[in-house]
Design a protein with these regions (language model features):
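Core catalytic lobe of class I
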Residues: 1-168
Length: 168
């Protein structure tokens, strides 16, 4: 938090192409590293995201993992992660470029009461990763993450039966 106002942070203003972060989640059970809740959490996220956005180049990106959160004492999900998404975009005046889902099948069952004890919910095995930027066209190149065509697709292309023409 204090980095953005430090001498080192000030030197980096407008010079960072990518910031990838996973801030502390608003957990129901407190942890040693901090556990802000509700409006306090949203205010904190807004302050931090404004500072991070100031570090970005004009075509830079901020990528944030926002974990799921549950309402205390009931088997319902909190809206705080979605409010966090909106707070980051609004407070920092950033565009939401894309959403990714991080599926973690090895995640411990949770929330434990509702998954293991009462058996009312399934394991919460994913989190959202949100890509923000100052511009609608940030520095990006999807060719860096493409996977090879399947054999079936290669055969379609080879036969010429695949219509790779203009799309609407």
């Amino acid at each position: 938090e204090g980095f953005m106002s430090s001498t080192e942070g000030k030197k980096l203003k407008g010079k960072v192409n990518l910031i990838f972060t996973s801030p502390p989640y608003p957990l129901v059970s407190p942890k040693k590293y901090g556990n802000k809740q509700g409006e306090e959490y949203l205010k904190w996220v807004a302050e931090v995201s404004v500072g991070l956005s100031e570090l970005l180049t004009e075509d830079g990106s901020l990528v944030v993992e926002i974990g799921n959160s549950w309402n205390k004492g009931v088997p319902t999900m909190s809206l705080l992660p979605l409010e966090t998404l909106m707070q980051i975009a609004k407070a920092s005046n950033l565009h939401v470029c894309q959403q990714f889902i991080w599926h973690n099948p090895g995640k411990l069952p949770g929330p434990a009461t509702w998954v293991n004890v009462k058996r009312e919910r399934i394991t919460d095995s994913f989190t959202h990763i949100w890509w923000f930027s100052k511009t609608e066209h940030p520095k990006a190149d999807n060719r860096k993450v493409l996977t090879p065509y399947t054999k079936a697709m290669e055969n379609l292309i080879k036969k010429g039966s695949y219509n790779h023409g203009e799309r609407p």
